[in-house]
Amino acid sequence: VQAVESADLVLYDALVNEELLQYAKQAEIIFVGKRFGCHAYSQDQINDLIVSMAKSKGHVVRLKGGDPFVFGRGSEEIDFASQFGIETAVVPGISSPMGVPASNAISLTQRHIAESFWVITGKTSEHKLSKDVALASKSSATVVILMGMNKLDEIVALYQNNRTDDLPIAIIQNGTRPTQKKVIGTINSITALVEEHKLASPAIIIIGEVVENASKLTSYIEGEL
C-alpha cells in the first residue's frame, strides 16, 4: 500500500486485485496484463515502459498478483531496469500455489501423507506441457500446476498412464476472490466435473492425497461450489 500510495505510475497485471488501485491517488495507472490469447502489451514492451516511465515520471510501481518470482517475470524486469541504472526494490508477495490451497484449508504437506510438493507451470514458453509433470506424477509429492487448464486432458492422461491409483484432485478458479469456484474429484472424474461446472482459467490444479484430507473451515469464501 505504501508503494502504491507513493507511485507516480502504476503498471498492473490481469490477476491483481483492482481494489489496490484505489491507493494510487496521485499516480497514472496503465493496465499491462497478459492472459491466454490476449496481451495488452508484450513482455518487451512492458520492460521498455518500466524504463521509459521511470526516467520520465519518477517512481514506477510494477503491480503483480502473487509472488513476482514464481512464474512472474519479476527477475527479468529487474535485470532489464538495472541495465539502465534504475534503482529497484521488491515487496514480497504470496504465490497462488501456497495462498490458494491454504485459503481452502488444503495443506500441501502433511505428516505420513506428503513430504514435499512440486509447483509446475502447465505451459512452457513453447506452449507445451512441462516435462516435470510426468516426473512429478510418479512421486508421492503433492503437485500444484499453474496455467494448466488448457492442458488438463494431457495431465489426466499422464497420471492414468503412470499410476494405478485414482488420486484426489482439486481445481480452484479465481482463488481467494469472491468469484472463486472449486471442484474436487479424482483423476478419472475431474474432466467431467470441470465441464459440468464450467471452470476455466485462471485456475490452479492441486493433485495428491492432501486434497482428500482438507481441514474443515469455520467460514468459507463466498462463491465456492
Task: Identify the residue ranges that each predicted region occupies.
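Short hydrophobic/aromatic-enriched beta-strand-loop microsegments
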Residues: 28-34, 85-89, 108-115, 164-171
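A contiguous loop/helix-start segment that scaffolds small-molecule binding in enzyme catalytic cores
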Residues: 55-60, 116, 124-225
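Class I SAM-dependent methyltransferase SAM-binding "motif I" and its flanking Rossmann-like core
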Residues: 67-139, 181-184
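Alpha-helix capping/helix-boundary segments
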Residues: 16-17, 69, 96, 151, ...
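Small/polar loops that bind or transfer phosphate-bearing groups
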Residues: 12, 92, 121, 146-147
